[in-house]
Amino acid sequence: MVHKKQAWAKRVKKERFKKKFLTRMQATRLLQMESVQFRRLCILKGIYPRALNRSKQKQSGNEKQYYLAREIKWLVRDQIAEKMMAYRAWEKKVKRAEAMGRSEDLKVLQTSRVKPRHSLVATIKERYPYFIDAIRDVDDAMSMIHLYAFLSPEIKSDTTIEIHHSLTSGLSERAKEVCERWDRYVARARVLTKGFISIKGYYYEAIVKGERVRWLCPHEYAHRFPPGIQQYVMLSFLEFYLEMMKFVLFKLESDLARDEADRLAAEDEEGVTRANAEDFANGAALAVLDVGANQAQAKAVKEAESKRSLMEEELHKVRELFRGLTFFISREVPAKHFALVINACGGRVATDYVPSNITHVVVDRPALPPGMKKHDQLEYVQPQYIFDCLNARLVLPVTGYRIGEELPPHVSPFSVSITNSAEDNAAVVQVKKDHPRIVGYVPARVHEIRKLINPSYSAVDPEGKVAHLEDEYSDEESHVAVPEMDMEDDVSLSGDELAEARRKPAWQEEEVTEEVQRPKLSAFKVKKQREMNLMNAPTNEVVARRRQALRKAQEKSRQTETSEARLQRKMSEVKRQEAATRKMQLQVARKKAARFYKMVSGVVQGTAKKVATLEAKAKHIAEGKLRKTEDGKGLVNKRLEARRQRAEAKGKKLKERKAGNPYKKLPKWVQ
């Protein structure tokens, strides 16, 4: 038996847990909104479920999502939650006006002045108290915005307070506008440092306010979005990121305009041309230390200064890379991406093919397009040349990049230090810390580029054998140095140990689809799970072979079947699915009909019982068993009244009968 102190301690812990955490259902009931609206509100406010340890989860359920109670209570009086409730009330008014045919009221309700809208300005200020915090979230924001700027909208709507399951025209236009403004800023400020073309799209990296921002732009191609996909979670993130980037871009553009104005003023006054350097001022990194500052603070400032100097050196190499070069981009090349790289590196993009004003022509064809004549003074290169020059921070020789030539390997600058410079090495080391699984192999093309940059460079491992061995024998766990074993350390195994070592499990080929603890299951459950192939337990070898043979026979029959047999099999599967759907629909209809019949019969029976009760009361009044009260609003039982009077005469009190529960006899659908 549990001691009373232990029971009390359990109760106190449970109550404390309930006060500190709320489940998703409790949170939605507290906020009086649906789960879809609650999820959207949490995304906008930056509130996420909490991962609890097992002891806490056992108190209220292992499969539930838990939120901090104080965070949910903050949402009760939040402006966005209030606007959501106002929108629900507005929807009811619109439906009422449509049902009653009030066209004038409907026009007034649908105007932008009456329709509720929410603002994310206060939310962004809450989530990002400092500007550098917003810069650190730009990578995810721009990747998502570029994705939805490429997709075509499916719903025409300018507002976002409604919960749309597909991309709206308003969000699509705003996403395209933000992408254009971001590309314009990166090109004007010349902060682009790396680029890479992959099968997913174009990867870019820029240094903005001392932070490395990486984003992905998808390849632009004709697409058709699959129907029936719910996108409201992604659209909620998109809405927030668009509003955040509006603030970020305004700040960046205003700072850039101020820096350009200061530079021009300084050039006019002093005649000194200064580089258009990015402002890396960031809090304590540039603060002047007091005399009595501690060593930890001095070390942090020193690291920030070294990081800042490396980034400045990296930007200085890229900004004047294509200075004096003019590129003409052919029509088959995506001009948006290559114009961004060229402009960010100090080059110019020509709109017309005028050989006297052009130095390079970017063509993605095996030969020149019709109508374009080849000139000897021009260099005709493939698109990879632009990105390789950016990553090498050097105008590479065009050998191997000309039209019709086989291109060299396109190396990712995010996992390998292409230039072997201090700033690149520091960036790659940081990436490997964040992503330990990145392979440290250096391709031969990287050694060639390093040799071009620094003629005195000599590769330590040009063929990559050492790196290959390190990747092959490296493990996630740290290796422990084990001394070599001598003959004295050798111990012979016994017969049982040898037999155990040679024994192979009989269920080696069996697929494990679910992990189940066997001691907790009954024999019947074990048998059922073996039949359904859902248990992590030894299966009979004969059964396993039979299943494997059956699977192989099915695969063989599907490989050898004709198109007519395949069509017939597909048609039979479709018929089975349709039959199952019809059966399910029929079951649902039967349940609805039974529920409706139960409701109607309950109403009819209740009416009949009420009529019978009234008739019985009228009969008792006629027989004299009941009489009316003095005010005429109630009835009194004469026999019960006489008994009460006799008890009062004897000085006793008649025991009162408890009033019945009025909801006890009602049907369940009423309760």
From Swiss-Prot:
Compositional bias per record (Basic and acidic residues), positions renumbered to this chain: 634-651
GO cellular component: nucleolus; nucleoplasm; PeBoW complex; preribosome, large subunit precursor
Alphabetical keyword list: Coiled coil, Nucleus, Ribosome biogenesis, rRNA processing
GO BP term (any one): maturation of 5.8S rRNA from tricistronic rRNA transcript (SSU-rRNA, 5.8S rRNA, LSU-rRNA)
Pfam family, one: Pescadillo_N
Coiled coil (UniProt feature): 294-323, 548-584
HAMAP family: Pescadillo
Biological role: Required for maturation of ribosomal RNAs and formation of the large ribosomal subunit.
Name of the molecule in the record: Pescadillo homolog
Native species: Leishmania major
